[in-house]
Amino acid sequence: MRTATVQRTTKETDIAITVNLDGTGDYSVSTGIGFLDHMVEQLSRHSLIDISMQVKGDLHIDQHHTVEDSALALGEAVAKALGDKRGIARYGEAHAPMDETLTRCVLDISGRPHCVYKSSFSQPRLGEMDTEMFPHWFHSFAQTAGITLHIETLYGENNHHIAESMYKALARALRQAVEIDPRKGDAIPSTKGVL
């Protein structure tokens, strides 16, 4: 099984994350930010990646460190679970509708971290989560996961739907990309021979 555990402890956060890329979408998520929990749960359920995430952050200051560090640790766990990436599909893409909203996600498990984020919100908060933290979450996740990530909300009005469709699109694209392609055997999916 492709699993990994990451423990990240700083003066700002204490994080324990375990992922199973070959899971069924089981999750146990507690970040102290209810809306972020809901989004990571969507990511787990729709990617079929089991995620256990326990985060204690300095929320008495603000959400920045908790959101950033949890995304960094989750990306690191995914990268660690992928190992040398032998046999994976590597690429994934998905469109995720949520009522009036549609988001597209395209990604490459390339080893070259990059994020293009095109989405916006008409209000500063969703529940207790600052909407300005969403682009930061996606950039941080892409950085440590080692993926090239393009995420774009094509249209939408409801802020909750916009956020949720982004995480669901990422989930579906990630599910495709981490899958083992039996035709590849144990080959690394690159002409360079390394990712």
Curated annotation (Swiss-Prot):
For this UniProt record, the keywords arranged alphabetically read as follows:
Amino-acid biosynthesis, Cytoplasm, Histidine biosynthesis, Lyase
- Cite a single GO BP annotation: L-histidine biosynthetic process
Q: Which Pfam families match?
A: IGPD
Tell me the compartments it is located in. Answer: Cytoplasm
Q: Does the keyword Amino-acid biosynthesis apply?
A: yes
Tell me the superkingdom of the source. Bacteria
Principal place where this protein is found?
cytoplasm
Q: Does the keyword Cytoplasm apply?
A: yes
What InterPro entries would the database entry show? Answer: IGPD_sf, ImidazoleglycerolP_deHydtase, ImidazoleglycerP_deHydtase_CS, Ribosomal_Su5_D2-typ_SF
What's the EC number here?
4.2.1.19
| PROSITE patterns per UniProt | IGP_DEHYDRATASE_1 (PS00954), IGP_DEHYDRATASE_2 (PS00955)
* Molecular-function GO terms, alphabetical: imidazoleglycerol-phosphate dehydratase activity
Q: Which GO terms describe its cellular component?
A: cytoplasm
Q: Which residues form a coiled coil?
A: none
Q: Which reaction does it catalyse?
A: D-erythro-1-(imidazol-4-yl)glycerol 3-phosphate = 3-(imidazol-4-yl)-2-oxopropyl phosphate + H2O
EC class: lyase
Which pathway is this protein engaged in? Amino-acid biosynthesis; L-histidine biosynthesis; L-histidine from 5-phospho-alpha-D-ribose 1-diphosphate: step 6/9
Give the family from UniProt. Answer: Belongs to the imidazoleglycerol-phosphate dehydratase family.
Q: What is this protein called?
A: Imidazoleglycerol-phosphate dehydratase
Name its species.
Sphingopyxis alaskensis (strain DSM 13593 / LMG 18877 / RB2256)
